[in-house]
Amino acid sequence: MSRRVPDVVGEYRHISVDLLDRDDCRVKLGTVAGITHIFFAAYVEKETSVASVPPNVDLLRNLLDTVEPLSPNLCHVNLMQGSKWYGNHLGPYQTPAREDDPRHMPPNFYYDQQDMVAARAAKKSWTWSAARPHGICGYAVGNPMNLGMLISVYATVSKALGLPLRHPGSAANANALYQVTDTKHLAKSVVWMSTTDACASE
């Protein structure tokens, strides 16, 4: 599901729904029963970290409020987070980052989402997990947050202008630790997380 109708036709049933709109969720998702696993990757960009918290929590809350009552066999909710959990948007942070590292000073909507899901799961029979990839490369229509696409565009423009392909940043930036995962590997990993008991509530 997504708010925007995808340009790509596939072997799936797409539901166009605005997760920020509780009524739209009830109308569009109110007939979808029997969901066992939720893979949540919705995101709303705002100008500040403070402003990002309410809408990003609402996206998830509206989904769960609608789907949970219709899905008594819900088993697992997976949250797609990212390295902002560790504070990469605030500057240098300890690497390698670990899941049990202390949280940075809020606000961070990942914290609010995870706390909400953990609190709900504690009262239910379903579990949750969180994936925190750094950079993601893969096919994503209309999504500029894709390092592979950005490098491809930069290389194409450089070639068209007759320029050599050079790193556009500083030496420190070029030598910084950065991890990238492919969307196919990421998809396999979250399916594994959502079906492996050892990953429950992690």
Where do the model's predicted regions map?
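NAD(P)H-binding glycine-rich loop region in Rossmannoid oxidoreductase-like domains
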Residues: 6-62
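Short catalytic/ligand-binding loop motif for oxyanion handling, primarily in non-cytosolic enzymes
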Residues: 9, 47-49, 85-89, 138-140
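Residues in the short beta-alpha loop(s) of Rossmann-like NAD(P)-binding domains
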Residues: 2-5, 83
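Conserved beta-loop-beta element that borders a ligand/cofactor-binding pocket
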Residues: 117-145
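Conserved beta-strand scaffold positions in the cores of enzyme catalytic domains, especially
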Residues: 14, 128-130, 202
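Glycine-rich "substrate-gating" loop/helix at the edge of Rossmann-like oxidoreductase active sites
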Residues: 102-105, 134-149, 168-183
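Conserved Rossmann-fold NAD(P)-dependent oxidoreductase catalytic core, especially the SDR/UDP-sugar
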Residues: 36-40, 50-51, 55-109, 121, ...
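Alpha-helical substrate-binding/gating segment
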Residues: 155-170, 176-202
